[in-house]
Design a protein with these regions (language model features):
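Phosphate/dinucleotide-binding and metal-coordinating scaffold of catalytic cores
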Residues: 76-336, 340-342, 354-470
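Recognition helix of helix-turn-helix/homeodomain-like DNA-binding domains
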Residues: 33-51
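Helix-turn-helix/winged-helix DNA-binding modules
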Residues: 23, 49-52, 343
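Short basic helix-loop element that most often maps to the first helix and adjoining turn
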Residues: 15-34, 59
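Canonical protein kinase catalytic loop motif
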Residues: 347-348, 352
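A short, Lys/Arg-rich alpha-helix, primarily the initiator
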Residues: 1-23
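DNA major-groove recognition helix of helix-turn-helix/homeodomain DNA-binding modules
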Residues: 55-70
Length: 470
């Protein structure tokens, strides 16, 4: 349905209600008093300068003795496919969304609030295809553990993007956008995941893979959370929202990711690099790393891969330079930190930026998080007999050696941060730890790695002077 067709359908309903008012011999003032509103609202609706909400349509129809069901059917046929992308209660984009057989899910943009464009998602391409891609990226990924169990609880399939959106409204703990029918009257304050309790039952399904029957309605961050491991968001009374994340399973060398999260954040702390704090907990008999949500209702996280047109390390470094020294230095420090701990999974989806939701401004680098595939988490006991040799077999996702990355980004600040790691020892958890011999071997390797990285000369300051402005 085009915007013109949508407007015509709305006008048809309003005209019928206006005609019914005139047949009753009621003035706009009299009708307004009957339904408990202002005459100005009736006037604007009949002039077409104010949209007719569902609640107001029902009240007017009942006051005029019109069949509400007929009105609802007519309204439903025009509105059931029309959605709005909102930031809080502000509409940014209005579009239709429908399944079209072999064509799959199709969107048609009806209206763009261009005056609010600085508030739009940074990764939203304002085309019909771009809207569909944005929605598909927003829902639970197909490779997430227990994805089928999570969606089965709600009577949905992994390919049903529209159905998932209809259930979860696109609500997320990454930002404050949501996607609802265009005539939806609800307020963000009553539905957002930051301030309202979400489905504990669905969190258990997400973490354990075991759950019950479909709930009538379930707002849940599980339907918009990325990543492949078992995980769940939990609201801890008087404390906040936490992410519980398990480890890999199915082989002798799996399951160590929660330990790596716990120990790696100690290294970041020692180096003085902003990072998310992790703890360990056995929840439902399964070891999990536990961290507090680092976004809030006013601040969103934007993965760098959602911003860059070309996802390469060079493009990323160039972009961070345009943001200023604080951003660039944090990125360089993260890359040196990753080289130190042999992080094998620093992809373009698990680091990025913090954004002010009200202004659209990028305000800070996001804290470092998601370090589970580091500190030799997959190493077998035999690998620890010669950990230095095993370390040389580790690699990052960039297809560039850790050492070559460090040669590019090493600066005086990173050198100072590395010096703090001399003679570093982990703080043991009170009850949940890797075997002591494994921890001791990792500490020894960290000492050797620190000295290796400190031997890399600082070339960055001279090199940057010769680089052209971007």
């Amino acid at each position: 349905m085009t915007e013109k067709e949508l407007l015509a359908a709305r006008q048809s309903i309003v005209q019928k209600l206006t005609q019914a008012r005139l047949e009753k011999g009621l003035s706009q003032e009299q009708l307004a008093k009957r339904i408990g509103t202002q005459r100005s609202n009736i006037c604007r609706i009949e002039k077409g300068t104010q949209n007719l909400s569902l609640d107001l349509m029902i009240k007017i129809a009942e006051a005029l003795d019109k069949d509400v069901s007929v009105m609802l059917e007519e309204r439903s046929s025009t509105m059931e496919k029309v959605y709005s992308l909102r930031l809080y209660d502000e509409t940014l984009l209005t579009f239709t969304l429908e399944e079209r057989g072999l064509e799959g899910l199709q969107a048609t943009i009806l209206r763009t609030e261009t005056a609010k464009q600085k508030l739009f998602p940074l990764d939203l391409e304002l085309t019909n295809e771009g809207v569909v891609k944005w929605l598909e990226r927003r829902v639970i990924p197909k490779n997430r553990q227990f994805v089928d169990e999570i969606l089965k609880t709600l009577g949905l399939s992994v390919n049903n993007t529209k159905g998932i959106m209809d259930v979860c409204m696109g609500l997320s703990l990454n930002d404050s956008y949501w996607v609802v029918p265009a005539d939806f009257d609800g307020k963000y304050a009553d539905y957002n995941l930051y301030e309202n309790r979400f489905s504990e039952a669905l969190s258990l399904v997400a973490y354990t893979g075991v759950g019950g029957s479909r709930e009538a309605f379930s707002t849940s961050p599980e339907l918009t959370t990325n990543g492949m491991l078992r995980k769940a968001w939990r609201f801890v009374e008087d404390d906040g929202i936490y992410l519980y994340k398990g480890g890999t399973e199915g082989a002798a060398n799996t399951g160590n990711e929660p330990y790596s999260e716990y120990y790696a954040c100690q290294i970041a702390d020692k180096m003085g690099i902003g990072c998310v704090q992790y703890d360990l907990e056995n929840w439902k008999g399964i070891l999990a790393s536990k961290c507090r949500l680092f976004t809030d209702i006013d601040t969103s996280f934007v993965p760098i891969g959602r911003i860059l047109r070309k996802t390469t390390l060079k493009a990323c470094l160039d972009y961070y330079k345009t943001l200023g020294d604080e951003f660039y230095e944090q990125l360089c420090s993260m890359l040196v930190f990753d080289a130190l701990i042999y992080n094998e999974d620093r992809h373009f989806g698990n680091f990025g930026l913090l954004r002010n939701n009200h202004t659209g401004e990028i305000i800070a680098p996001a804290p470092i998080f998601d370090n589970g595939l580091s500190l030799f988490n997959y190493a077998m006991p035999d690998d620890f007999k010669n950990l230095s040799a095993y370390a040389k077999t580790r690699s990052n996702p960039y297809r560039i050696s850790y050492e070559d990355v460090c040669k590019e980004v090493m600066g005086a600040k990173q050198k100072a941060q590395l010096r703090r790691m001399v003679d570093f020892k982990f703080t043991r958890h009170p009850s949940l730890n890797l075997p002591e011999e494994r921890l001791t071997a990792i500490e020894k390797q960290l000492g050797e790695r620190t000295r290796e990285l400190l031997s890399i000369p600082v070339q960055r300051s001279t090199k940057r002077k010769n680089e052209p402005e971007r």
